[in-house]
Amino acid sequence: MAAAGSSQAPISFGFNRSSKKKLLVSDGEKEEEHEKEYLVGAEGKELLSANPAPESKPLVIPLIHKNRWAKPNKDKEEDAAPQTEDEAVLSQAVKELIEESRRAQEDNSETNQTLSIPLLMQNRMPDGYEDREKVDVSLRPDSAEAADYDVVPVQQYGMAMLRGMGWKEGEGIGRTFKQDVKPLEQKLRPKGLGLGADRSALKHLEPQKPRKPLKPGEEPEEESKGLGTGSAVQIQSGAYKDMYGKVEGIDPDNSRAMITLAIGGKVVTVSLFSLRLVNSAEYTKYAKDLSRLSKVHQESKVEPHRDRTPEKEQGRKGGEKRSESSRNADVKLSKSSGNGDSNNREKRHRQRSPEQEKEKKKIRPEPHGWLRRDIRVRFIDKNYKGGKYYNSKMLVEDVLSPTRCVCRTENGCILEDIRQDMLETIIPKEEGEHVMVVLGKYRGMVGKILHRDKQKSRALVQLQGEHDSAETLSYDAICHYTGAQDD
């Protein structure tokens, strides 16, 4: 029985598990966050502590000159039985020989640079691990943990690697000609600005006005900077003429800007070419002055000659009275001289009267405007923007006044404050196209072209609406219409 019991002894299996040490934030660091800190004083916006924090040194990641491959049998060697005295002496001798040969190789590599092995070849994987069909990654280092990334911030990683390679801030790199070269920063060029062009160079070409000496208590005028977000401007044309505002945004592709008006706070979109930069003093003084926008102020500003005409007439009348009194005192002179004076007086009077009539007729009524929305016109002004839009077709988007409008080109560009004399009407080439009557009795009516007479520059138009009749109209009285039609 005893023999049978001994043969049935229990069998047990054991496994050894090696765990990697993880980088964790110690409890001491967490406790330091909650420690009390005593303040000594305050300088500006900075608080002075009784225990100032040590200055942070620049982070350095040392360069790996030679890879230290992990040994896969490291755990087995540790668990192996201790070596005898003879084996320990033998292993120590082998290590010393290997170290001595390594130093000799390093000395030879320093003396003879032609025999140096490239760094990538020195640090390559040993043979038999990753050069077969089955890749053995046992020599590879362990993957990084989250705590490893906390030690090195992402923003300082690149600079830390450069410092480990020997780079120092402010010192140039290179072997013979060391020079600190600043990195080239690319700047976005505005649309239409040619290569090599610089907008700042225009300021040096402009004639500079001589500066007057400042009076006691007078402040120097503030020089207006370039047009940008927050700049104070004045609108010189369009529906918001003579109003002040500040730039909220700029669209360089369409040459337009978003302006917040000083009066009312409304955000409007205007052309960049209708803006004038102003300084802060002018903006503060006139931005919210409503008296500038009154009709009385505008009339006195546009027509100042009206105030001076009565004075001129009084001066002329006074001169005539003085000449008459002097002539009465010299009645005793010869009749021939008296007759000559009277004739000269009548001639001078005849010469003055047409001038006075011209001054009275200076204010002429504006010509009849033929501008309408949704009509196609042709641009005929060669001087506008250097003739960029000359002889191009465009569409009238909006009519600001009887003789001014806003146009949109075929490319989608918006042109503001375009005068009527810069445009001409367009007649469709094909019959059956819609036109609008812009002048004459049927002004504003839409119709279809039935027949065109090129020799006499007129067309037979079938009008729509109440008349519904065919009329012969001149080319100057009709224009191509692209808006909605009543079928």
Swiss-Prot record:
Residue spans crossing the bilayer: none
Coiled-coil stretches noted in the UniProt entry, renumbered to this chain: 88-116
Location(s) in or outside the cell: Nucleus
Any one of the GO CC terms: spliceosomal complex
Region ranges (Disordered): 65-121, 181-232, 295-367
KOW domain: residues covered: 226-253, 428-455
GO MF term set: RNA binding
Residue ranges of every copy of the G-patch domain listed in the record: 154-200
Bias kind Basic and acidic residues: ranges: 96-106, 200-209, 295-333, 352-367
Family: Belongs to the MOS2 family.
Function description: RNA-binding protein involved in pre-mRNA splicing.
Subunit structure: Component of the minor spliceosome, which splices U12-type introns.
Protein's name in the database: G-patch domain and KOW motifs-containing protein
